Amino acid sequence: MADVINVSVNLEAFSQAISAIQALRSSVSRVFDCLKDGMRNKETLEGREKAFIAHFQDNLHSVNRDLNELERLSNLVGKPSENHPLHNSGLLSLDPVQDKTPLYSQLLQAYKWSNKLQYHAGLASGLLNQQSLKRSANQMGVSAKRRPKAQPTTLVLPPQYVDDVISRIDRMFPEMSIHLSRPNGTSAMLLVTLGKVLKVIVVMRSLFIDRTIVKGYNENVYTEDGKLDIWSKSNYQVFQKVTDHATTALLHYQLPQMPDVVVRSFMTWLRSYIKLFQAPCQRCGKFLQDGLPPTWRDFRTLEAFHDTCRQ
């Protein structure tokens, strides 16, 4: 037990070393104070320079003297024992062949690693609890056997049913014309023309809207080979904004059990852009803000807002 307490440290030299550190810090502070004050209290420039140099040299000598004193005392302090036994595990340090069987040092390393692992695991657990992915509170009571996932029925609807839904939506809105085509097989592509305001390319998989691109009424929506251009953006910032809002609307209108209602709701929302350049903002009452009309349409009331006014 006495070996554990004896760490071979000269306490008197240790106390003197602390005082030497304080003296060194004071002398270093005086050096910076001298540099901060500069040349003062002399009438002539030459006298100020000589006084400044002499004062600066004295402060540097003080720093050098205090540093040498601290180095001398550090050699007198001594080094503590490198072995810190942990109860019965301290017996492992008595192994005479430390290089061949370094059990004690490995045990200390494993102990430090375990503490770090526990600390980081606690941090990760706190972050994961803040970003919980549970969709309902009833998942804790489900059985261990997971139910087989049902295949989505939205993607396997017959093309005739899709054509009938699009045809009925086309008849609902006289100011909107919808042209349906299938250039790549069974997946439908819609070209929606809303009055003389804009054109919308809608890429569908069965009755699931996959992508929308909004362009101006006079912009070209076809590629060189005559197919609908589903990749290039509009040349006008106002229609780029409407494209972003349409993508947000696709995420809002989600009802997998009734896909026809989703398409009809989206087309109703899209039809509200018939007065894109005529309706004022419902909050600020202005027609233009930063050179743009109100490009946002509320998903429930279909009222017009500027992008910054809807916040």
Swiss-Prot record:
Compartment(s) where it occurs, according to its Swiss-Prot or TrEMBL record: Nucleus
BP-aspect Gene Ontology terms: positive regulation of transcription elongation by RNA polymerase II; positive regulation of transcription initiation by RNA polymerase II; protein ubiquitination; regulation of transcription by RNA polymerase II; RNA polymerase II preinitiation complex assembly; somatic stem cell population maintenance; transcription initiation at RNA polymerase II promoter
Effect on the protein upon substituting P259L: In NEDSCAC; uncertain significance
Modified residues (Phosphoserine): S132
Keywords: Activator, Cataract, Intellectual disability, Methylation, Nucleus, Phosphoprotein, Transcription, Transcription regulation
Domain of life: Eukaryota
Record-stated family: Belongs to the Mediator complex subunit 27 family.
Protein name: Mediator of RNA polymerase II transcription subunit 27
Organism, scientific name: Homo sapiens
Gene it is expressed from: MED27
